[in-house]
Amino acid sequence: MKMWGNAISVKTVKKVLFLGILILASFATNAQLIKDSKTLADMQIQLQKQQLLASGRSQQLFEVFKKPLSADEKQALEYLYAYMPLSDLADYDGDFFFQQTKATLTAKNEMPWGTQIPEDIFLHFVLPPRVNNENIDLFRVVMYPEIKTRIAGLNMHDAALEINHWCHEKVTYRGSDERTSSPLASIKTSFGRCGEESTLTVTALRTAGIPARQVYTPRWAHTDDNHAWVEVWIDGKWHFLGACEPDPELDMGWFAEPARRAMLVHTRAFGAYNGNEPVIEKQQCFAELNLIQNYAAAKPVFVKVTDTDNKLVKDANVEFQLYNYAEFYPIAKGKTDQNGISSIITGLGDLLIWAYQGDKWGYKKISVDKMDSVTINISDKHTTGITENFDFVPPVQKTPLPQSTSPKVAENNTKRLHAEDSIRTAYMATFKDSAWVAAFSAEQGLSAEKLLPIFRNSYGNWEEIAKFISGTSKSQKEWAVLMLEAISEKDLRDTKAEILNDHLANAFNYNNPASSQDKEFFAKYVMSGRIANEMMLPWRSFLQKQFGYEFVMQFKTDMNVLVAWIKSNIRIDNTSNLHSRAPLSPRGVFELKVADNRSRDIFFVAVCRSLGHAARINTATNLPQYYDGKDWKNIAFEPVTENITEKGFIRFVNSDINFDPKYAINFTIARYNKGVYRTVDFDYGMKLSEFEAKTEVEAGKYLLVTGNRQSDGSVLSSVTFFEVPTKLTTDINVVIRQDFTPIIPFGKINPSATKFIDYQTNNAIPLSNLISTKGCIMVWIDPDKEPTKHVMADIPAVKSLIENWSGGMVFLLAGNKVSSSFKPSNFPNLPKQSKFAFDKDSNLLLHIDKLRKTNSGSNFPVIAISDKNGNLLYYSEGYKIGIGEQIAKVIATLK
């Protein structure tokens, strides 16, 4: 096979120039879509750059301009092409984008608000098919007729609300992995995490020609995790709404109060942004906008960076880091200007500011409500064994804003939600049960025990999984099951049969394992099409055809042959995919001959697997690796300043025999690299006692971060710098700081007089029957809302602790909060003493509100803990992650 270099051939250049002339001719047409001269000029410049960038796929992408397009269709396509990320240039073709454009312009022409939307708003927030890092699909083409019918006769405001109800019929909240499903895949599955719900809702709104954007707080300040929601542009103003969580009116949502405590809220604008909203980052093809002032009290913070001689440092990297999941997460990044200054508008809580340039670094904690500037001196000095304690305080919790709708309107909305739940539940009933799986397994001669979890996790994609298995030859059915077990749950939910078959049918061309142990290894690291967080696509047969016999023979004996080929043929561009952050497919990398580092690494693994060699991405280091028959070997495409293959060991020592800290909840470690520490990716929630006696890590400099989040959202944190020498063991004491302030009751209830109605029997239950001799945990829930689902997922993590405590636990429902789809069995693995009951007319909740002189309103879930005498010791309301940890702290005092 010819091993060409980075130079573009004369033939390719001529082809690109010809297509460029063809495309640019449209600028002289009578197009009315884009009239702003500055926008047109920038688009023309960017389009020429994109044509050269995408020259490897010029035919697939640009041949569409030879079609008989209308002037506006051409202009819309030109705008998309001018600013689209590498992932879209690599993995989609011109006809795909033409269909998107045609559907968008149809909506613009048919919807009554189409002519009311300003040009820039339309280009940034209606035309782009991509919302975030999802696999984009033909949702607009498929769903436009249904959505059009649904909103017929409505104004823009009411249409936006109605579309959110439509989305709720299709999808509800459930957590999942980091890969973002496409909108149609989420509908097929019937659920998605908040990032997927908001991607669906934004896409649905844009399908109707309504400007919409996905809005994120990258990390909360008062609790772990993040959240995404939607903003919709109505009659000249942006409003927010909860994706797939319809409220009676815009600017309502359970997240509205948490957002008032946020440190940053942001969104991305596609294209060259010249609007008036604050910009965090501006690139040629997108801008990241800072929306914090729309939600919370905020102010500018200025960071000055100096060197050891107190001279200003230009172009230093500045990260605004927030404690979350036991690490300091950069919610925003910037660079210093010629005056050594970087700034951001942020909420009024605490941040750790980290500045670095090359191997020089420094940091300081800042309390934004008390300070507006900080100077950080950077140096290359490292001091090990140093521990610093920091108290991180989030923005203060404020009195909830009053609800803007009447009780009657809220009640009617709740009835609609229950009806929509029923529609979705009816669809979910079409997913296959154990009886169907047993019959199918017998028909295929396979184990029902193995196939049951596969089909359960496939949800609405069960037909594709069944098609794949039934279409497999008898000799390969066992392999088909092994491969399905090796891919992710999300792959089972959205991968088509032909994609799975491409990997199975072409997996044995270069390798064929014998032993059962080898089979499992082979299925995971050779046969599987799942590598990292990319969309699984059919690249195996394609890649096998691209590399000739001579190359394959050389590759089998020398992995450097492939490394050299990639370095010579794949150009690295780490900026042109920033507004997508979706990895390019391996086939897309090969065709485009351009990739970011992550996609290049995935491509390396894909080629290895295609040619029968085990390979993976190491989840701890994110480096690509191949298996040499004995060990996993790193591949480093970038120059390194140290030997990354050298190892050392950490022995974690628990300083508290009564508490077993968990990774990414109570502590993390981060490894130093080029001026900054990045968290090592061990399993989330892994207990300290579960680590090996000596944990192998890359040798180098490290940072231990610990944290103890308090009930008010503040964190008692510490950082310890240490080093792991090559082949030596370093002992690290994991010390979780404690708050020894005694718990003071905030009120008292009468356990004998307080009664609930048992959900199952409808009989009255006195609270005194639940309290036993220890106390009771009371949790008021709204089962269909995301905050409650988080709490119900957190509590199983402390199940055994609550069971051993042996106090009472009751989950309390309000009659109007229970839909027909609710079942206690939907929440498995709760403590064995758990009961579900009704707090009639919210009597106890209202009494507790009176004791606290507050109104919890609809801010569910609400958690209250009493001792055996009815003294109320703990109270929490609203969205929080890790509530199980908070409960554990309180009941530990109730001996």
Over which residues does each language-model region extend?
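Short, internal strand/loop/helix patches
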Residues: 824-860
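Secondary-structure boundary elements
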Residues: 36-189, 225, 262, 411, ...
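Short, ordered, surface-exposed loop/turn motifs in non-cytosolic proteins
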Residues: 308-327, 348-350, 558, 657-681, ...
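Short Pro-Gly-centered beta-turn/loop motif in secreted/extracellular proteins
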Residues: 341-352, 357-359, 366-369, 686-712, ...
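Structured interaction patches on ligand/partner-binding surfaces of diverse proteins
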Residues: 359-381, 710-738
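Short, acidic Ser/Thr/Gly-rich low-complexity loop/linker segments typical of extracellular
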Residues: 324-346, 674-691
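Hydrophobic/aromatic-rich core segments of domains that either
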Residues: 35, 149-150, 154, 159-165, ...
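Short active-site neighborhood of thiol/selenol oxidoreductases, capturing the structured segment around
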Residues: 767-791, 795, 810-812
